[in-house]
Amino acid sequence: MDSSDRIIADSIHATSIQIQIDADLGQVVMLRAVAETVALIAGFTVDEVADTRVALDEAATCLILGAIPDSQLHCDVVADSFRIRIEVGAVCGDTDPIDTAGFGWHVMHSITDHLTADHDPYDRAQGGYPVAIAFTQVRRVH
């Protein structure tokens, strides 16, 4: 848990949800809908919600394309009135399915305030490499 997680976890009004879907591009719409709803409930503007949706779409698509067959994508969303943090994870067939020099990563980096990618060693029980992308978007005070 990094400092932004602790700040959100300590908030009295934090909203948290976990969702698991099949690692299938057709399921990304469900993730977008959940994240959008959480962000709207937390009081983010329509533009901020759109940025969150785009970042989540890029992260989920990247991991789904690298996921092993018949696997699941996990998504954790935590939000309060100041920020939203989303972590998406999947078991991938490659050690590093994330192209940090690619356009999608550049987009995520541009529209979020904090972006990380974690790669774990091969997990024999899961049959692949656990990979996660996490990002935080801070609500802008207008």
Where are these regions (language model features)?
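Conserved ATP-binding N-box helix of the HATPase_c
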Residues: 46-70
